[in-house]
UniProtKB/Swiss-Prot annotation:
PTM note: Sumoylated on Lys-124, Lys-142 and Lys-461 with SUMO1.
Keyword Metal-binding: yes
GO terms of molecular function: histone deacetylase binding; identical protein binding; protein kinase B binding; protein-macromolecule adaptor activity; signaling adaptor activity; tumor necrosis factor receptor binding; ubiquitin conjugating enzyme binding; ubiquitin protein ligase activity
Localization: Cytoplasm; Cytoplasm, Cell cortex; Nucleus; Lipid droplet
Enzyme class per UniProt: transferase
Protein name: TNF receptor-associated factor 6
Keywords: Coiled coil, Cytoplasm, DNA damage, Immunity, Isopeptide bond, Lipid droplet, Metal-binding, Nucleus, Osteopetrosis, Repeat, Transferase, Ubl conjugation, Ubl conjugation pathway, Zinc, Zinc-finger
Crosslink feature (Glycyl lysine isopeptide (Lys-Gly) (interchain with G-Cter in ubiquitin)) location: 124, 327
Residue ranges that the Swiss-Prot or TrEMBL entry lists as coiled coil: 302-356
SUPFAM superfamilies: RING/U-box, TRAF domain-like
Subunit text: Homotrimer. Homooligomer. N-terminal region is dimeric while C-terminal region is trimeric; maybe providing a mode of oligomerization. Upon IL1B treatment, forms a complex with PELI1, IRAK1, IRAK4 and MYD88; this complex recruits MAP3K7/TAK1, TAB1 and TAB2 to mediate NF-kappa-B activation. Direct binding of SMAD6 to PELI1 prevents the complex formation and hence negatively regulates IL1R-TLR signaling and eventually NF-kappa-B-mediated gene expression. Binds to TNFRSF5/CD40 and TNFRSF11A/RANK.
All residue ranges annotated as the MATH domain in the record: 358-507
Amino acid sequence: MSLLNCENSCASSQSSSDCCAAMANSCSAAMKDDSVSGCVSTGNLSSSFMEEIQGYDVEFDPPLESKYECPICLMALREAVQTPCGHRFCKACITKSIRDAGHKCPVDNEILLENQLFPDNFAKREILSLTVKCPNKGCVQKMELRHLEDHQVHCEFALVICPQCQRFFQKCQINKHIIEDCPRRQVSCVNCAVPMPYEEKEIHDQSCPLANIICEYCGTILIREQMPNHYDLDCPTAPVPCTFSVFGCHEKMQRNHLARHLQENTQLHMRLLAQAVHNVNLSLRPCDASSPSRGCRPEDPNYEETVKQLEGRLVRQDHQIRELTAKMETQSMHVSELKRTIRSLEDKVAEMEAQQCNGIYIWKIGNFGMHLKSQEEERPVVIHSPGFYTGRPGYKLCMRLHLQLPTAQRCANYISLFVHTMQGEYDSHLPWPFQGTIRLTILDQSEAVIRQNHEEVMDAKPELLAFQRPTIPRNPKGFGYVTFMHLEALRQGTFIKDDTLLVRCEVSTRFDMGGLRKEGFQPRSTDAGV
């Protein structure tokens, strides 16, 4: 019941005066309540701005009753006012109607002035107490209309603008968009560290001066800014013209074939050079002194003699080129022989070191963080250890470590560890197939007194190909565990120190198996022939 109706009823009946007074007090209390709460945006907006907006365009639950609808905008009354004729309107709607359409009520055309409008605080309080649904897509919350603005400030489904690309996204998605998806997010070139928007990265990568590119001729990897000099000066297989191309030799060949071409075509090049000199001679032949326009003088030198001297010099230089080429080939042969000798000595030293481990070998795998990153990026990681001997004489073995990819079936994100037999110096003096016990351990590198190593013990199975005498340098069949250790357990422990993983292999042949097994240790089943 509006305040106007209260006053009319008071004039007609004394018995209803108490009711009107109570209603007026209720309306007054509503005004105070709304002015104190400040929960709704309309209470905080200036009157000039309020006159420009219409009713509440929100979804009510249950639906809005018609008595709370503005007859002009057909939405829920905002800043409800009442006319002397008893109709309710949004303050902004009726004010605009009076100014634009004249001083009359839009419903019954009764004369209506702006100063005759008065706030309907009772209706305002009733409307602000109605339940509405959050208008943001995806949000299922409901609240009183008076709390809608506060909710929208914190609603995770409200639309906010991306400061980088100026597109709208829900608040719950904006951080992910800004960091991961926005085409205008700032990234840095991994090669030159220049910052740029992500959408420009592909274009930059195609021209980055510090990006690694592969020479199309020799396959050498260089940074882009070095490639022009590489093509022009260093690339051994880049096509180059003959040095005598200016004299008429039109052959093209790889740069590393140029010296041979010059050697094999010396006579041709000399003839071309002589012809060029002869042509120069003809163009510079002494002319008649009576022709000053040619610029010639009777005292010009003897060009024929000069040509003969140049030809003689070319012949001598040709001989020198042949001698230098022969010396270079001889030196190249000596260098190649020295390289083979050094390689042989390095192999012998490595073989001697492998024989000194006496069946206990610790494999240091450096840059292990790089291998873990490759595994996370689903790039295969397979590493082989250097060879080592079980004794002197003894069998030659090596280890193979495989980081299983996240997509691998049944063994995703596991370390696989295997042992392979190799061709060794003493194979002809040893009994085959190999028989013995092998203990594989990933060492705990903590400083604790008692270290939590991860280890497995396995017995050789002579019937498997993995333990037969190898016919090639390394037996392709291995013996070990596909699921030796999970990568999560590896990361949680202290197995990696200074970016290095330590893997220990202890081997005891059937003639030396005492003391290898720990009391009470039961080996689990292995994966053979992998």
